[in-house]
């Protein structure tokens, strides 16, 4: 545990930084976090590279489980900003009489666990992970925990699926007003992109030659993707669930993701509806860690070329359900190998009777400057 707590301490508040209030400020992570609100969710690197994508035997080993235990506590204290003693224990379900290779935990009543904390995060009840939501005017934000219950075959466990369904059903119908009570745009925060180029040949290569190595980041990165064959069914379930919500509540859904060291834009859509039914199009906005240099080595550049080539192919998830990478706004490529960040902004106060647009703006680093890349997501078209 000292390792995880010490790592957070040195990264979040280095001893060599200038004191607060100094004339010469330290332009570092502490200043950034002190200046900007954050919504945090863990991914594999908050535990160790590829957590959840190894074999059942490795995932259940005492060493892996102990590392997960301490990483969970450190994440709870630093990123979720809660006292360590308030973290409920994860307990495996005992009501299952058959063997399961997936981690199936008892659900947690988070509202009770955090009742004494007035600043407690709005974690969804009846799920063992940290999935939580925020309501921001006409925007609803779902921050999904994709690590607590992850395995080779599973991303979200049954209790979490139930909690997400209950939350989506309770979203207020879009009244197309601001201020108002309805939701116009739903952002689903997924640490890894839901819509991304599918690297089938690379997956087959890894499966053929073996990839069960704790330090082999290329292998576990492929297994982590929603596009991996083992997660394709659950990816389709997620997209269909959100499309159903979009239709019922008359709102737009967008995915916001990172982790893949590139900037990209994709879409998942139903092909059996009219062009005016724009609720049937989910946008995928992909950015990356703002301090991470993007694909700089020769091997990474070759991988970037492969990504752009594979991205041209449309992915068929079902007869009338497809996923597709789009040419990056203002570019002739599908993915941008550049350090970047993404801003999302509402067009509030406009006279559009359908509601507010959601603007996505990527700022991409070049050798000497930055480039802007804008994309607008229209509100759901009004049907009179």
Which ranges hold each PLM region?
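Metal-dependent phosphoester/phosphodiester hydrolase catalytic core
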Residues: 1-384
């Amino acid at each position: 545990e000292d390792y995880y707590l010490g790592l957070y301490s040195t990264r979040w508040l280095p001893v060599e930084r200038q004191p607060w209030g100094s004339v010469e400020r330290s332009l570092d992570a502490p200043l950034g976090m002190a200046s900007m609100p954050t919504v945090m969710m863990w991914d594999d690197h908050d535990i160790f590279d590829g957590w959840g994508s190894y074999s059942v035997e490795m995932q259940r080993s005492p060493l892996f489980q102990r590392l997960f235990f301490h990483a969970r506590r450190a994440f709870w204290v630093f990123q979720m900003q809660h006292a360590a003693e308030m973290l409920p224990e994860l307990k495996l379900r005992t009501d299952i009489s058959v063997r399961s290779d997936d981690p199936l935990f008892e659900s947690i009543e988070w509202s009770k666990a955090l009742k004494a904390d007035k600043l407690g995060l709005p974690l969804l009840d009846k799920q063992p992970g940290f999935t939580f939501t925020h309501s921001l005017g006409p925007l609803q934000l779902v921050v999904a925990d994709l690590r607590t219950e992850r395995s080779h075959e599973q991303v979200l466990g049954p209790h979490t699926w139930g909690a997400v369904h209950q939350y989506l059903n309770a979203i207020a119908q879009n009244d197309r007003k601001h201020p108002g009570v309805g939701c116009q745009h739903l952002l689903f925060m997924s640490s890894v992109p839901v819509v991304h180029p599918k690297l089938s040949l690379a997956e087959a290569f890894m499966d053929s030659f073996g990839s069960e190595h704790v330090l082999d980041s290329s292998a576990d990165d492929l297994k982590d993707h929603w596009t991996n064959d083992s997660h394709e069914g659950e990816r389709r379930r997620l997209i269909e669930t959100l499309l159903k919500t979009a239709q019922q509540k008359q709102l737009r859904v967008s995915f916001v993701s990172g982790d893949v060291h590139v900037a990209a834009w994709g879409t998942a859509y139903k092909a059996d509806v009219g062009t005016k039914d724009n609720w049937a199009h989910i946008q995928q906005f992909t950015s990356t860690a703002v301090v991470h240099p993007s694909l700089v080595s020769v091997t990474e550049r070759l991988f970037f070329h492969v990504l752009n080539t594979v991205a041209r192919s449309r992915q068929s998830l079902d007869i009338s359900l497809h996923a597709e990478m789009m040419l990056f706004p203002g570019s002739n490529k599908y993915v941008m190998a550049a350090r970047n960040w993404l801003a999302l902004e509402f067009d509030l106060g406009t006279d559009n009777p359908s509601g507010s647009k959601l603007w996505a703006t990527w700022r991409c680093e070049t050798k000497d400057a930055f480039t802007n890349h804008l994309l607008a997501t229209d509100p759901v078209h009004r049907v009179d």
